[in-house]
């Protein structure tokens, strides 16, 4: 099993219900493709280090997953890239010797 950490930033002007639905949707994408969510953190609204698409703040989310292959992370990245509500994301494969 491989462990990945996914961090993504949601635009700050999204409504609370839409933001919660977005998080559930992307967690569902991960689990539907065979990933197991180990940990999920909502860091809340934070200031960005630099402006992204004219936004100075964003809602930060961190998800750690276990998966056999990269299908779940590939699908997450594909859909996050075309989603206007996610302004930045990164997927990191954690070292196996931890």
Swiss-Prot record:
Alphabetical list of InterPro entries matching this protein: Ribosomal_bS6, Ribosomal_bS6_sf, Ribosomal_S6_plastid/chlpt, Transl_elong_EF1B/ribsomal_bS6
Single Gene Ontology MF annotation: small ribosomal subunit rRNA binding
Tagged with keyword Cytoplasm: no
Entry GO terms, CC: cytoplasm; ribonucleoprotein complex; ribosome
Domain of life: Bacteria
Biological process according to GO: translation
Entries under Gene3D superfamilies matching the protein: 3.30.70.60
Keywords attached to this entry: Ribonucleoprotein, Ribosomal protein, RNA-binding, rRNA-binding
Pfam family of the protein (one): Ribosomal_S6
Role, per record: Binds together with bS18 to 16S ribosomal RNA.
Family statement: Belongs to the bacterial ribosomal protein bS6 family.
Full protein name: Small ribosomal subunit protein bS6
Gene name as annotated: rpsF
């Amino acid at each position: 099993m491989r462990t990945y950490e996914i961090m993504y930033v949601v635009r700050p002007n999204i409504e609370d219900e839409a933001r919660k639905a977005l998080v559930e949707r992307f967690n569902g994408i991960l689990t539907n493709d065979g990933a197991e969510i180990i940990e999920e953190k909502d860091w809340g609204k934070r200031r960005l280090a630099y402006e992204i698409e004219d936004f100075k703040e964003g809602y930060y989310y961190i998800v750690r997953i276990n998966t056999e292959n990269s299908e779940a992370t590939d699908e997450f990245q594909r859909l996050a890239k075309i989603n206007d509500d996610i302004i930045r994301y990164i997927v990191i494969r954690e070292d196996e010797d931890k």
